[in-house]
Amino acid sequence: HTHMIYRSEPRSYRDLPIRYAEYGTVYRHERSGTLAGLLRTRGFTQNDAHIYCREDQAEEEFLQVMKLHEFWYTQIFGIKDFYMRLSLPSKDKTKFAGVPREWNVAVEIIRRAMRRSGLRFIEAEGEAAFYGPKVDFQIKSVIGREETASTNQLDFLAAKRFELTYRDRNGKEKPVSVIHRAPLGSHERFVAFLIEHYAGAFPLWLAPVQIMVLAINDKVGPYCQELLRELQRRDLRASLDERNETIGRKIREAEMQKIPYLLVIGPREQQSKTVAVRERGKGDRGQMRLEAFLDMIDKAKRPQ
C-alpha cells in the first residue's frame, strides 16, 4: 500500500528520497508442519519501510539502511557474531524476473554500499529474491545455529509493476528505485533469536524481570513490600517472592529463571535498612544500602 501512497501524486526528482515506515502485522497461511514456535508463525509484526529514490541516491540510501542495522544489532542488542549475506541470482535466468542489466546495476549498487559500510559480508549465488538482489542479516544462536534475522532488498521491478515514476530535471518520466527494509524482521522471530542468542540470560535492560526481592520469612514482608514499591517507582521491573519456601529454594528457582539481580532480605537487612545482593553469574555481592545498589546498576539498566 505504500506504493499506492507514492503513486497518489506526481513526484519530482527534488522530492526524493521519500521514506515511508510503519509497524504492521502480516498474516501468512503457513502449513501446520512448518510452524515452529516464535521462529515461524502465521501472524507476525514488522517494522517495515519502503524508500523511494533516484538511482544515483540508491547506494547512499542502502548504506544508511546497513548503518541502521549495525546500530540496532551491535549497539542496542549487543550481538557481535553476525555477518551480512549479499544474495545474488543464479545462472538460471528463468527463476528471476527482469533483464540482466537491471540485475547487474542493482547488485553493484548494493555491493558498493556494503563495501562502504565496513560490515563483514559474503556473496551467495542463487539466494536472491525473484525480483531483485537482497542483503540478509545472518546471526548465530548460542548453540551455533545460523538464522536469517532480517532481509533488505533493492526492488527494481516494483517501479514497472506499479508504475512508480518521478520527473527528472528535464521533465522526463523515470522509474524510481525502491528499497525495502525491515531491520528487525519479524518481531516475534527476533524475540526468539534474542532468547537463543543470550540463552535466556538477557542483559539487565532487556530482562523481563530485572530484580527479584526474596523474603527469608514473613516478618520481613513489610520491608520487602517497601523495597518493591521503591524499585517499581524507579521504573525497574521488579517482583517479590514471599512464598512459604526455604530461601535456598527461592534462590535456586530465581537463578534458573536467570534473573539478573536477587535481593535477599532477612531480619538483619530489615533492621539495617539494607539489601543483600546476588548477581547472576557472580554470586554474592554483599550487603549494601538500596541507593548504593541502584547506583551500581544505573549504567547496566540502559542499552550500552
Model-identified regions with their sequence ranges:
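NTP/phosphate- and nucleic-acid-binding module
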Residues: H1-Q304
